[in-house]
């Protein structure tokens, strides 16, 4: 379902429009002015996908029905820096849920695997109450400092919380 103005609408997903057919979650929609398109990044079958549309309410379609890379990953968040460089933050299942970043191709359809860099791994006591989980990344930039906001611990634990790390580069290192 979606909200347009004060009206609720329902969008049925057409299986032919995207990779995968189960476990859809964590969609984020971005408008890229340069392309005059909306990009929806989402997780499906524990893979990262991106679909495009001319409207923020869709329909969204994948021209090529495949993930942005083959490794299982979730919780994507796009960040385009002031110089136009696109970065994708996401969770890899490397010793728990760990937040990583990679530069994207200019068309925003693939990550550049040679640029993969670890950002945040659950290490602080509050992050380890039930599981090694750092997830749900989002990046903001203010006055030359990058802020990576994330959730940590297991979502079913009362200690599930929000943390942040800072860096002078979108690729880290994050402190």
Where are these regions (language model features)?
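Structural motif
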Residues: 47-51, 96-103, 157-164
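Hydrophobic core segments of beta-strands in well-ordered, beta-rich domains
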Residues: 18-20, 24-45, 77-95, 99-102, ...
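Short loop/turn segments immediately following beta-strands, especially the blade-tip
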Residues: 51-58, 102-112, 165-175
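Loop/turn-rich, solvent-exposed surfaces of beta-rich toroidal or solenoidal domains
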Residues: 132-175
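Single conserved hydrophobic/aromatic residue that forms the stacking wall/gate
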Residues: 1-5, 10
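Surface loop/turn motifs at the tips and blade-to-blade linkers of beta-strand repeat domains
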Residues: 18-20, 67-70, 121, 128-130
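Short glycine/serine/proline-enriched coil/turn segments at secondary-structure junctions
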Residues: 59, 70, 95-96, 155-158, ...
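Asp-box/WD-like beta-propeller blade repeats and closely related beta-sheet repeat scaffolds
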Residues: 46-82, 92
């Amino acid at each position: 379902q979606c909200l347009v103005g004060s009206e609720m609408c329902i969008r049925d997903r057409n299986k032919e429009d995207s990779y995968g057919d189960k476990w859809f979650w964590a969609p984020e929609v971005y408008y890229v002015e340069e392309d005059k398109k909306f990009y929806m990044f989402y997780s499906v079958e524990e893979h990262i996908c991106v679909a495009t549309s001319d409207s923020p309410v869709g329909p969204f379609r994948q021209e090529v029905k495949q993930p942005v890379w083959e490794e299982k990953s979730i919780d994507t968040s796009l960040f385009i820096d002031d110089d136009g460089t696109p970065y994708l933050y996401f969770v890899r299942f490397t010793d728990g849920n760990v937040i990583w970043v990679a530069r994207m191709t200019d068309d925003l359809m693939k990550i550049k695997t040679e640029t993969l860099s670890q950002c945040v791994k659950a290490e602080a006591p509050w992050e380890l109450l039930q599981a090694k989980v750092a997830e749900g990344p989002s990046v903001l930039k203010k006055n030359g400092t990058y802020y990576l906001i994330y959730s940590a611990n297991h979502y079913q634990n009362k200690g599930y919380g929000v943390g942040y790390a800072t860096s002078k580069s979108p690729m880290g290192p994050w402190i």
